[in-house]
């Protein structure tokens, strides 16, 4: 299964193609992605982050083996071939254990890598950029690279032990700021300099040599950099190709390497395409997909209020608000301002902290209630036009069934379509 290496080879040969990575564990988002890839006959890259999924369960409660089982079961149920499915691990390193001494955090990171590789994840992002409890801030390139090389060695040994061959594909480096959208209001963003990118690569090459890992260098397919794209709660910093041109040209000197861009959510279709052309050819997307899910659910909740007596309604939006207020740990440190500003952010922020709450049993029950209420009889077309106008066009043309589930999935697929088009190449 060398989809990624082949994509990089084609890109380096001038095809201007790429691949997008779906970074979500939500079943409806994953179903939308699997069905979209199936319809377009493309491989599908699905990634779990070290926050979501780890050897202790992460915030989803899933280990890497659990996550793989969950995704593969869904793929099987949708007749999607498993050899077209690529699983990736994102920001794998001591990220979850920064409050521990480095020795302890890295021991946990070793086990994290083992658990991802043993579970069959093939795209491994090694990220040891974060300082642990007893580390200097920031870490030097050399320390970051030494730790990444240590984890690469663990990964290679684990892969050979479990699968009899070493066929992992690696991503190194990190973006600034932190994963998952910026906390503060942004106006402009520093693009990674070519010198900084070169220094990261050279430090890693040297560290890998010291670990006897020269042979895996061609399988290091991408470097994570900041091309100047980011979003905060209400704003998006759009890609400006001129500012990233020196960085873009620099990677042309490396035969088997492209860039990976994080936080590409909410970029325009034109910006996504230009990113791929400029060699930022792995595009990560996550919050934009759960944002689309949330949009569709809010629209369906509004339709429900028009059609169903108040006492029989699901009350999804109120249930969501009540649970978020009752358990504020996922949004409290991110959303600021007065009560109204925080209320709006909880519902509508681009950073989409609401995504952490969908698995809650009360919210899931309200979601199921909403779908039941709207599945009993056809949704009137004028209401679909009012609240889901993009889906209305497809319903009218006969290409989309106007059921709650299909409307949600299609709304998510509108975002996936932008990424697919950006990555198609010439």
Swiss-Prot record:
What Pfam families does this protein map onto?
A: GatZ_KbaZ-like
Single annotated GO MF = enzyme activator activity
Which residue ranges traverse the bilayer? Answer: none
Kindly state a single biological-process term from the GO annotations of this entry. Answer: D-tagatose 6-phosphate catabolic process
> What domain of life does the native source organism fall in?
Bacteria
Record-annotated disulphide pairs: none
Anything else the record notes? In contrast to E.coli strains C and EC3132, K-12 strains cannot grow on N-acetylgalactosamine and D-galactosamine, because they carry a deletion and thus lack active PTS systems specific for these compounds. Therefore, KbaYZ in K-12 strains is not involved in the degradation of these compounds.
Q: What does this protein do?
A: Component of the tagatose-1,6-bisphosphate aldolase KbaYZ that is required for full activity and stability of the Y subunit. Could have a chaperone-like function for the proper and stable folding of KbaY. When expressed alone, KbaZ does not show any aldolase activity.
Supply the PANTHER family for this chain: D-TAGATOSE-1,6-BISPHOSPHATE ALDOLASE SUBUNIT KBAZ, N-ACETYLGALACTOSAMINE PERMEASE II COMPONENT-RELATED
Query: Would you tell me the protein name for this molecule?
Result: D-tagatose-1,6-bisphosphate aldolase subunit KbaZ
